[in-house]
C-alpha cells in the first residue's frame, strides 16, 4: 500500500471497524489516531498528508486491537468529556453520557431560585467519576456553595477526587466532600451537620433491570461497572431508597433532579408520590425519552415542579 499517512490510516481504520461491526467506526478511528498523534480531530483533517513515525503506527495498531475487543474508547484513552471538562476514567467508573448533562442544567437553574446570600448545600448520590459534582463546582457562578458527593465504591471516589483536584481551582475543589456511602452516610456527625440542610439533590442512580442488563451493548455489558448500571429485578429499586433516605436531610425548600429511564418512569413517579405526597415533572432527553425527574419540595406548602 506504500507509505502510510493520516488519510490512509483513517480510511483503513474506519473500513476495518465497519467490517468488524464496531459501533461508531469513524469516531473510533478519529479519536484513536488523534490520541496517538496528539492532534485534535480537526487537525487530523488539516494534516491528511502527515506520515506517522513507526512508533506512532505501532501504537495506533495496538489501540485498534483494543477497540476490536469492544473496549469503550473512553477506557482505552482513559478520558471522557462531559460538558466543558475532561475526566480521567477507568473501568471502576461509569462513562458519563450526554443525557446526564441535563441533570447539571436542572441543578444550575435551581440555584438561581435561592436567595443570593444563602449558602447552598448540594448533594450528589452515586458520583462515579465526579462528572456532575465537578461540573457544578466548575460552572456555578456563586461563591457560597458546598457539595457532598457520595459513592459506595472507594475506587470510584479516588478517581473522582483526582478529577476534582486536576480540573478545578483549589478553592472550588475544596468545596466538594467525597464520602463513601451507599446513599447517605450513616454516621451521627453527618446527620447532625446536614439534617434538613440539603438544598439541591441530584443523582444518576442505577436503573437497569437484571434482564435489561443482558440486552445492553457488549461494550457496556462487558466493561462498565455493573453495580453502577443494575438496580435489581425491576430497575426501580434504588429510587425508593433514595427518596426515603434523603427526606430527613432536605431543607425547608429544596430541589431534586434524578436521572431515570423511560422503562421505569411510571414506577418512579409512584414511588416519589408515596414518599412526598406530590407530583414531580418528568423531562425528556435529546431523543424524546423520559430522562429526568425534577421537583421542588416545600415542607410547608404543596410541591411546585420546576417544569416549564
Give the ranges of each region predicted by the language model.
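Conserved Class I SAM-dependent methyltransferase catalytic core
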Residues: 233-296
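A short N-terminal interaction module
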Residues: 1-60
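C-terminal lobe and adjacent flexible extensions of AdoMet/dcAdoMet transferase-like proteins
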Residues: 294-300, 308
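Conserved AdoMet
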Residues: 35-110
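Residue-level signal for inorganic ion chemistry
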Residues: 32, 70, 100, 132, ...
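Mobile active-site "lid"/loop adjacent to the S-adenosyl-L-methionine
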Residues: 206-237
